[in-house]
Amino acid sequence: IKKFKLSNYFKNVAIRPGKPILFAKFKNKEKSFFGLPGNPISSAACFRFFVYPYLLNILGVKSEKSFKARLKNKFEKKKNLTRFIKSKLITTKSGNLYIEVLTGQESFRIKSFVKSNVWSLFKAGKSTFKKNEIIDCYIPLGWDKNHFL
């Protein structure tokens, strides 16, 4: 950071997957810098939830909104972490949306990422999420017709 004269805005945040992440700006310049983690799912999550919204913002594109779905199965996590969870979105015949938390949530596990079709957001401050609880969800990049890659 010192060598390249960066102003450190944040380094490491309390999320999983996604450690470590860095966002900085070059001092006296209008250039930004993201440092993404090495594990594939951590990198994908950080790009999706930090880099992509940043790019939309500097381009003046309206930020996206999450959509809501009910949790199909109970989920537990550490209370102090926000978790971006690889999930499967399911639509019932009556049109209700449910998410199923997939097994294999470790940041090096790609199979569950390939099987997923939605990111579920489990916010910090709570450790247990009950069946049928309403959860914020985000479509993976490339699936949203209102935004571009």
Task: Give the location of each predicted region.
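Flexible glycine/proline-rich
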Residues: 2-149
